[in-house]
Curated annotation (Swiss-Prot):
Protein's name according to its UniProt entry: Exportin-T
Lineage of producing organism: Eukaryota, Viridiplantae, Streptophyta, Embryophyta, Tracheophyta
Organism: Arabidopsis thaliana
Disrupted gene: phenotype observed: Delayed leaf formation during vegetative development, abnormal SAM layered structure, altered inflorescences, disrupted phyllotaxy, reduced number of seeds and reduced number of lateral roots.
Chief site of localization: nucleus
Gene (UniProt): PSD
Compartment list: Nucleus; Cytoplasm
Annotated Pfam families: Exportin-T, Xpo1
């Protein structure tokens, strides 16, 4: 070995070679690459070196040089490289016994040689090296080595240039078109003939070579004349290969790949259909029943599915009755095998089962009636869906415990099933009776298997039923159309195997909930429904996830059945006694509880039932007491324990108090205001006593946010439930909620005040008179008069809280103003905050980026003007307010803010704001009369450079009664004024 060869070998070394030595070797190789004579060096090494590392390095270097420097190479150098690598590929060995043969090297070296030739073809064919393919074919008689090399060159050309499976540059696309056009004219027929001859000659003696040639041919079918391969010579040969048991699977599979390429070739459907007919594809149907893991079964499966797709496409695109009949016959012929492939075999990744089946089902939609064969196909499609949606048993334990693996598999299957369920519902619309019978039979088969090992089958059958229900109309569900009247009773009265598994239990309960419309109409099944939820299939299920989900679904069922459950109250409470006891005593801090699974829905469900007026008053009182008493006791005990709890135990005690409050809140949702205040005040008294207990939580732990928010939620609830009877509790409640409130807590506090104002209107005046000054001082201490930035961007969490507080303040002020409570702003305690409030509302009405907020502020001004300003020339109710409105609001908001280019008239929200601004101007004229008009004419309009005549026209419009005309004129005025300011328009 010379120095270069040694350096190349070291640079490829991956073992324990010194890193410094390897780096030195790589550097040396790179230096050699840069020498002007590098092509000669590489060619010489390729002829004489037998080291595969050296051969590969030289070929790679040649390819790099050609790609980067071809245009700058001399003609002699180009010719030298061309002749040399072509001679190597064609086995033209120089007369030297020490010469190496690159084409007899390992595959990676031969592939690299093929890539070098493909690169030369890229630059030189057909203008410089027009005979490359014809010259190469003259050497094919030398046997397998050259034939193999020829195929590798064609494959490299496909990979590097022609195939559209890879992204191509515009230049590459242009070169590919040039190469293909030249090959079609010059040599493709000869190449196709060579493929045929080689495969015919070597199919038995060298199956690997035959498979290589067939794979090469497959790549070219998409762009050569189809007649060169789809003819009386090639097609029989290919099917002979596919059907020959004595041949290797590799050859048979490669032949199937060629037929698939013919089938998939882009063609006019008028030409494609006869081709598909002549193939007589039924000859290979039996091959898919072999070993599903074999390469041949995989290739034939891909052929059949590809064939079916093309037949279906022809059926869609051809319009004549004859061609449609032919295509449907072909489709009917191949479909049973396609269904078999879908159910038993590994489907090719390029084939979309759902897309194909949806396409087929769509061809059946317009038919007046389905034939027997089509109905059979529908059943087979449903079986495909059932098999596809089955979980893999290997994940059974993971899915039951819902560990990380189980969660990932459930998420994956949930996504995977979406399209399959779309297909199911589509089939259900085309053939509802067949679909229902299939689901019934699937359920029956699942039930017959008493083995727990049938979990996946049972879950799949129940999932089919659940998904099918999504497309049913309410009327069909109520009446139990088709065999639904048989399916639902079967669902309710059957003990399904595998019910202990989480997946089966969940989908079973989801099904009952989905088909509740049927049960509402058939109340004889209510005991079965209750049994499913109350026994070990639901709330008493051994799996925590099931029992919690059952609580939520039970609540939904109760909401639908309501009064029909009154006769079963005792049974329900008796069955839930242990569950309720567990919920009120368990350590909730040790559980990760979220949303609908936190157990509170059981209390909501019970509240809905016992809150009905159909329940006798005495019993209702007993039931409520039975539930409220232990929950209140839990809160009282928790308060005592939390006071003395260690830092570790404190969160646990707080969590238990928190859940008890949530449960009480949920329980109260079943009781309405009329019941608890008018017809059964004793119930109202119990809720008042409960409210007393909960308010003590605020006294004991005012700064524990979870407790504070839950108590606030309960107060919200009691406002709706107790109505005005809640008034005596409000001062104490509001005082506690207001104490030491942070901005975030103030937001929640104002939400409560908004509810109270909307509920009680002016009746809340006295309470609001006391509360508003405290709210105002808190807020105006942290929010400046000109407001906070309205777009948070990259701001701190603290700033976000302040922005949210400011936003809620606008809502709060708007609610006060629009519920006839604006006098609250004028009380002695509140008067000090009037100016900062007005400045903030003014600034916001002009500048806030949120148009809806600006509109609310304009509406505040409108209401205050109406409330605080009498008719023209009367004494002012709020000294200085009129001047402030005319000079600040009318000018800055109603004129300047509208003139700003950001005020976009084409935006719907902005247009609504503009309407409010027009209303404000109209109200100002009604209240201030000529004083307002004079200010517009003498100050506002001149400052905006509005011509006198246009200003006068606007004032005339303002004094009229046509507000729509006023709005249109003012918009036109503003738009013209903007143009004038741009210097592109002058008023005349």
């Amino acid at each position: 070995m010379d120095d270069l060869e040694q350096a190349i070998v070291i640079s490829f070394e991956t073992g324990a070679v010194d890193s410094a030595l390897k780096s030195q070797a790589v550097t040396y190789c790179q230096q050699i690459k840069e020498t002007p004579s590098i092509c000669s060096i590489c060619i010489e090494k390729l002829w004489f070196s037998k080291l595969v590392q050296v051969q590969f390095w030289c070929l790679q270097t040649l390819q790099d040089v050609l790609r980067v420097k071809y245009g700058s190479m001399s003609l002699d150098e180009q010719s030298y490289v061309r002749k040399s690598v072509f001679s190597m590929a064609c086995l033209e060995v120089i007369d030297n016994e020490n010469a190496g043969r690159v084409v007899e090297g390992p595959p990676f070296v031969k592939n690299k040689l093929a890539q070098v030739l493909a690169t030369l073809i890229y630059y030189e064919y057909p203008l410089i090296w027009s005979s490359v393919f014809l010259d190469f074919m003259l050497h094919l008689c030398k046997g397998a080595v050259v034939i193999d090399m020829f195929c590798r060159v064609l494959n490299a050309l496909d990979d590097e240039l022609i195939s559209l499976d890879y992204p191509r540059t515009p230049e590459e696309i242009s070169v590919a078109a040039r190469v293909k056009d030249a090959m079609r004219q010059q040599c493709v027929p000869q190449i196709a003939r060579a493929w045929y001859d080689i495969v015919s000659m070597y199919k038995n003696s060298d199956p690997d070579l035959s498979a290589t040639v067939l794979d090469c041919m497959r790549r070219f079918v998409s762009w050569i004349d189809i007649g060169l391969v789809a003819n009386d010579a090639f097609v029989p040969l290919l099917f002979e290969l596919i059907l020959s048991d004595g041949l290797s699977e590799q050859v048979r599979g490669a032949a199937a790949g060629c037929v698939l390429a013919m089938v998939s070739k882009r063609m006019d459907p008028q030409s494609k259909l006869p081709l598909l007919q002549t193939l007589q594809i039924s000859r290979v149907f039996g091959l898919v029943s072999g070993d599903v893991d074999s390469d041949l079964v995989s290739k034939v499966s891909a052929l059949l599915t590809g064939y079916a797709v093309e037949v279906l496409e022809c059926h869609k695109r051809l319009n004549s009755e004859d061609t449609k009949a032919v295509s449907m016959d072909l489709l009917n012929e191949v479909l049973p095998s396609v269904f078999y492939v879908m159910q038993k075999c590994e489907v090719d990744s390029t084939f979309s089962i759902v897309q194909f089946l949806l396409g087929y089902v769509s061809t059946l939609k317009g038919l007046p009636a389905l034939k027997e064969k089509q109905l059979l196909h529908i059943t087979q499609i449903l079986e495909v869906i059932r098999i596809q949606i089955c979980y893999d048993p290997m994940y059974r334990n993971n899915l039951n415990s819902l560990d990380k693996t189980g969660l990932e598999e459930e998420d994956r299957m949930s996504e995977f099933r979406k399209d399959l369920f779309v297909l199911l519902r589509t089939v259900g619309r085309v053939a509802p009776e067949v679909t229902q019978h299939f689901i019934r039979n699937s359920l029956a088969n699942a039930v017959e298997s008493s083995s727990e090992s049938n979990v996946e089958e049972v879950e799949a059958a129940l999932s089919l039923l659940y998904s099918f229900g999504e497309s049913m109309t309410e009327e069909a569900m109520k009446t139990g159309s088709g065999c639904l009247s048989e399916l639902i009773p079967m669902l309710l009265t059957t003990q399904f195997p595998g019910h202990s598994h989480r997946l089966v239990a969940l989908v079973y309960l989801e099904n009952i909930t989905r088909y509740m419309k049927f049960i509402q109409e058939n109340s004889q099944y209510i005991p079965n429904v209750l049994g499913a939820f109350l026994d070990d299939r639901g709330l008493h299920h051994q799996n925590f996830y099931v029992s919690r989900r059952a609580g939520y679904l039970f609540m939904r069922v109760v909401k639908l059945l309501k009064s029909k459950l009154v006769p079963f109250i005792d049974k329900i409470l008796q069955n839930l006694q242990d569950t309720l006891s567990q919920l009120t005593t368990m350590n909730f801090a040790s559980r990760e509880l979220t949303g609908t699974e936190d157990g509170s829905h059981i209390f909501e469900a019970i509240g809905i039932i016992i809150g009905l007026e159909d329940v006798p008053a005495e019993k209702q009182s007993d039931y409520l007491s039975l539930l409220l008493t232990p929950l209140c006791q839990q809160i009282e005990a928790g308060l005592v324990q939390a006071k003395v709890a260690s830092s570790e135990d404190f969160p646990v005690k707080i969590a238990n108090i928190q859940f008890a409050i949530v449960a009480i809140n949920a329980l109260s949702k079943g009781f309405n205001e009329r019941l608890v205040t008018a017809s059964r005040p004793g119930i109202g008294l119990m809720f008042k006593q409960t409210l007393d207990v909960l308010l003590r939580v605020l006294i004991e732990f005012p700064k524990v946010e979870p407790l504070r928010s839950k108590v606030t939620s309960f107060i919200h609830r009691m406002v709706d439930t107790l109505g005005s009877a809640v008034f005596p509790y409000l001062p104490k409640a509001l005082e506690q909620l207001l104490a030491d409130s942070e901005p975030k807590e103030m937001v929640g506090f104002m939400v409560l005040l908004n509810q109270l104002i909307c509920k009680f209107n002016s009746a809340l005046h006295d309470i609001l008179e006391e509360v508003y000054p405290v709210v105002a001082v808190r807020i105006f201490n942290v929010i400046p008069r000109d407001g906070l930035p309205s777009r948070p961007g990259a701001v701190t969490e603290e700033m976000r809280e302040l922005i949210e507080l400011q936003r809620m303040l606008y809502t709060f002020l708007h609610v006060i103003a629009t519920h006839d409570l604006s006098s609250v702003f004028l009380t002695p305690k509140s008067r000090a905050y009037l100016d900062p409030m007005m400045q903030l509302v003014l600034n916001t009405s002009c500048n806030h980026k949120d148009i809806t907020v600006r509109k609310a502020c304009v509406q505040i001004f409108i209401k205050l003007i109406k409330d605080w300003c009498a008719e023209p020339y009367s004494e002012e109710k709020v000294p200085g307010f009129q001047n402030f409105v005319i000079e600040a609001f009318a000018t800055n908001c109603c004129l300047y803010s509208v003139l700003d280019k950001s005020f976009n008239f084409s935006d719907a929200n902005t247009h609504a704001l503009f309407g409010e601004i027009i209303t404000a101007q109209k109200v100002m004229y009604e209240k201030f009369g000529n004083t307002f008009l004079m200010h517009l004419m003498s100050k506002s309009f001149p400052s905006a450079h509005i011509p006198q005549d246009l200003a006068e026209q606007y004032c005339q419009k303002l004094q009229g009664n046509d507000i729509r005309s006023l709005k249109s004129y003012y918009q036109s005025l503003i738009e013209n004024l903007r143009l004038q300011q741009n210097g592109s328009h002058v008023f005349r």
